[in-house]
Amino acid sequence: MNRNSKIKWIAETAIFIALLITLQAVTKSMSQFVTGSMVNLVLITATLASGFASGLTVAAVSPFFAFMLGIGPKFIALVPFVALGNIVLVLVWGLLCKKGVEMKNMITALIIGALLKFVALYSGIVKFAIPTLLALPEKQAAVMGANFSL
């Protein structure tokens, strides 16, 4: 990767991150379905338009910006699992559509990406994070709760 292509990649990725933050802020008062759909649209568009690495970068930082804007999970411990779900979505779209953006590839990526993102979120949050947090002794849970309330 030469210098100009690195600069182009950084600029394109920054534009998608800025678009993502703007959409999250604008749709904050709307339903989570609207905000989540817009975020997924930006992730997929970043992957298809700017490449796999750009999509992965936007997918990884998206939930942290959502947390800072008060949109995403209320507990910071859940944010990495949302990032994992986003990364899974980008991986599916990147792998299935890398040979070309054809309708059958896009429909397949849409279905498989949604299912695998659900599996990643469900297994990460419901099966791992919440039981782990609930298993903490009372004093540790109180300290963590106080940290999360800040």
Model-predicted segments: where are they?
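Loop-helix junctions at membrane interfaces
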Residues: 1-150
